[in-house]
UniProtKB/Swiss-Prot annotation:
One of its GO terms (cellular component) is ribosome. The keyword Thylakoid does not apply. It comes from the Eukaryota. One of its GO terms (biological process) is translation. It comes from Encephalitozoon cuniculi (strain GB-M1) (Microsporidian parasite). Pfam families: Ribosomal_L44. Keywords: Ribonucleoprotein, Ribosomal protein. Signal peptide: none annotated. This is Large ribosomal subunit protein eL42. InterPro entries: Ribosomal_eL44 (IPR000552), Ribosomal_LSU_eL42 (IPR053708), Ribosomal_zn-bd (IPR011332).
Length: 104
């Protein structure tokens, strides 16, 4: 489980300096039906001959890579930062303290 703070002080390309950024998780955008791969696939599928490419039957990965959206609080410019793989992500959760008693 990964706990990420909701704000992060990092470099902004537009402001050309360090400033606070609002952190959120990037979502997958809608596929473009006119992308080169889709155009090629549609062309290949036309006519006789059935299915031309293998249909993926099983997933290879269990998790997805975490991508952060970082939005500058000064100029509202947004950029993305990829992180490692994680199953569970929490934004702004409680931080662990050293030597604190366990609460059940």
């Amino acid at each position: 489980m990964v706990n990420i703070p909701k704000t992060r002080n990092t470099f902004c390309k537009k402001c050309k300096g360090y400033s606070a950024h609002k952190v959120s998780q990037a979502k997958k955008s809608k596929d473009n039906p006119r992308a080169q791969g889709n155009r090629r696939y549609a062309r290949k599928q036309r006519g006789y001959g059935g299915q031309t490419k293998p249909i993926l039957r099983r997933k290879a990965k269990v998790t997805k890579k975490l991508v952060l959206n970082l939005e500058c609080t000064k100029c509202k410019f947004s950029h993305q930062k990829p992180l490692k793989r994680a199953k569970h992500v929490i934004f702004g959760g409680e931080r662990k303290r050293k030597g604190e008693a366990l609460v059940y």
